[in-house]
Amino acid sequence: MLQLQFFLVVAAILFCIGIYGLIVSRNAIRVLMSIELMLNAVNLNFMAFSNFVDSGLIRGQVFSVFVITVAAAEAAVGLAIVLGIYRNRATIDMESFNLLRW
């Protein structure tokens, strides 16, 4: 049987990959994917702690479903914003997203 430490290490690796993608990437789609990867790492932590700490309660699973719902809404809104900026600027480079400059 897998231990809690295994899930925590996997979640930490996923979160670090997401942070790396968030810092390094200049593409808006990759940034959104990195944020989703970080949220999935958080969900893995919720599920692991819910299973190993108190397996009788389902609070971790319920909160994980809530985070998945919010992440789906965030992805939809983020992609809509990126699509709108792409139609105006013809690029999805994060450096050109500064809409306050003329």
Curated annotation (Swiss-Prot):
Pfam families: Oxidored_q2
Any one annotated GO CC term: plasma membrane-derived thylakoid membrane
Predominant location category: membrane
InterPro entries the record matches: NADH_UbQ_OxRdtase_chain4L/K, NUOK/Mnh_C1-like
PANTHER family on file: NADH-UBIQUINONE OXIDOREDUCTASE CHAIN 4L, NADH-UBIQUINONE OXIDOREDUCTASE SUBUNIT ND4L
Binding partners and assembly: NDH-1 can be composed of about 15 different subunits; different subcomplexes with different compositions have been identified which probably have different functions.
Entries under NCBIfam families matching the protein: PRK05715.1-2 (NF004320), PRK05715.1-3 (NF004321), PRK05715.1-4 (NF004322), PRK05715.1-5 (NF004323)
Designated name of the protein: NAD(P)H-quinone oxidoreductase subunit 4L
Biological source species: Synechococcus sp. (strain JA-3-3Ab) (Cyanobacteria bacterium Yellowstone A-Prime)
Gene coding for it: ndhE
